[in-house]
Structure formats: C-alpha cells, structure tokens
Amino acid sequence: MQLFLLSFLCFYSALLLGLTTSAGRNEVVRSYSNTPLRVLLDKGQQELRIKSALNLIYVKEVDQELWTKFTGQVVIKISRSKKNITINGNLFKSSAIYLRGGPQHTDPIQYASGFYRGALKVTLTPEGLLMTNIIPLESYLYGQIAGEMNPSWEMEALKAQVVAARTYAMYMIKHPKHPLYDLEKGTGDQVYLGAQSEAVRIKIAVESTRDQVVTKGSLPIKTYYHSRCGGFTESAKLVWNNSEKYNRTSVPCQYCQKFPYLWKTSVKAHEIFKVLKIPLEKLKPFKISIANKSSTGRVKEIAIETDHEKHSINSEVLRHLLGYANVKSTRFDLKINEDEIQFQGTGAGHGVGMCQWGAQFLAKNGKSYREILAHYYPSYKIESAQPYF
C-alpha cells in the first residue's frame, strides 16, 4: 500500500465528490451542476468486491485526508468486532469509507456489472454494508437517462426526460429517502445504469438543458414519469391515495390515444391470497372485482370477498405485490376463470406525470421539450434552478 495526500483535497473537490458534511449540504451551492447526489447501489451486504478500469482503487476514511492506494480488486468486509470495515484484510478504524477508481473523480469504479464515476461510499450499518455512489448531479444524468429512455429517440423527447430526471433528483436531495442516501438506483426512483450507459446524444441533451428544472415557487417539484399512460395521465393523489401535492392533474396523451399498448396476464388466486396474507383455507369460494375506477379509466381499488371476510386493496399496491412486469398498469379489466384471475389492460407504468412514449410522439410532431413538459406538468414553470440548500 502507498499513502499519499491528494493535492485536490479542497472544498471544491469535496463538494464534487460528495465528501461534504451534512451541514455542507445546507449551504448555498454556487454551481448547481456540481451538487452532490447520493445514489443507493446496495445494502445489507456482508462483503463487497470493487474493481476499476485503471486497476487502481483509492480508499479514504471519512474523517481522514490521506488516501490509500490499492492495486487490483479490493474486498470489503465487516470486522470481527462488527464495528469496523476491513479491506483486503486491512482494518480501518472508521465505520465508513470512500473509494474512487483513479486519481480523478471522473475515473470509473466498478461494482458488480456497473461502472460509476465520482466516488463510492461504504457505510457499516446494523443491517450490513451499505454502498452509495456520490456523484455530481449533471454527471449522474449522463449515466441515468439511458435507463429510462432510448438514446436514439427524438432529441426534444430526450431533453424533456433530462429535465424531468434532473428535477426529480434535485427534489430528492432536499427530501432524501434515507439519512444515508437521497434516492435508489432502480425503479423505486430512477433507473441508473452508470457510466457504461453514457452516450453522445444524452450528453447533448444534458448540456443543452443544464440547470433547467420544473418548478413551483422557484423550487423543484417531484416530477414523476412513466412509460405509457394508455390515453390519459393520472393524478398522483388518486394513484397513491396520499396527500401528494404535485402531479395532481390528469391530461390527455395523443400518442397513447392513437397507439395504445395492450397487455394481458394471468395470476392464480392463491398467489393473490398469499401476497395479501389471507389464509389459503379461506380461498374458496371467493369473488374478486374492481371496486372503483377513476375518471380516466384507471382502477383505484380491487375488492376480494369470501364467505369469511372482505378485503380491499389499492391497485398500485397490488401491482407492486404481484410485480410491475406482470401487472403493467392500473388501466385493466378483470376476468375470473375458475381459480385464475386474468388481467387485460393498456399502458405501462403508474400513469403519473410525463408519459415517455407520449413525449416521443410530441417530439416527432415538432413539439419542443418545453412544450412537452408544459403539457404533462401543467401550471408549473421551467426555469434555471435556484440554489436552495
């Protein structure tokens, strides 16, 4: 191992790498594009294996200035005392460390099949090792957009997606999902693939809309978006039955009205009973039906009735329990065939906010990204982000 002090350990580098204190995240950020974002990559692990394209790993304890250089793969484990972290058998006193894939913050570091710029932070928690990617917000977008939209799509659609994703991420920085991270890398927030998904057209879309966000009162809103709405988008309040204050307006969607995405799937009744934790001995006889729909045709609640009891479940919760890949949206009808429930529907996703296929259609028909965003987020503004940390 070789110890050395990196010359760029100054406030700017700290901000760029996300090595700021919690107090630092509340200070005014002069350069919005350098705002550090904390993306959850994994948690609850007993061991983590990290590599880099340069075959070098730089490691730093959170409360130290010195970085340790390792060659090749590093294996991170929990110490026998359960209070510290070890790397390749070397004990580190801290319960949290930073890792980078080279001397520059842009050098990618590898975990599993993903490559990530910025830094990785590994924290020892009661549940195991938790790992986040600390990365400047605009750099995050380079590796995030392809996870949600095809880079070959119309440029104005890509720009609309960039602004929506940037706004969502900035909102989550201010309203983090967890004390240790702002958002997750999967469909629970925004799909983030990392550096290997970067593309020239994505970088153009990011740079040409730099700092632009969807706002209300000069603050970023929570910009939901989805694949296909099926003809109309839906109010967030109706979908999640909560006090969601943004995305409360349903709008017609031209593309989905003309080219609806049709799907169908079948689920055994006992599978639904199982996820709802209803005893299987109470399975028969049963009746399952749509309790009510919204004005746009989306199912709000499902009613399940047996001789013993009655249940109702929010349709979006049911999608989550049965799998989003199975029940693709809440725009569906039900049919019972003996002990099998058949779903037949249209659209894909929760239906709230921007419809991505609708955005593509609008872009193909000459609409700008600002016009696209104004259609799906009516009554909100598109403006340059104002520092609000």
PLM feature segments, named:
Residues 1-389:
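Conserved, single-site charged/polar hotspot
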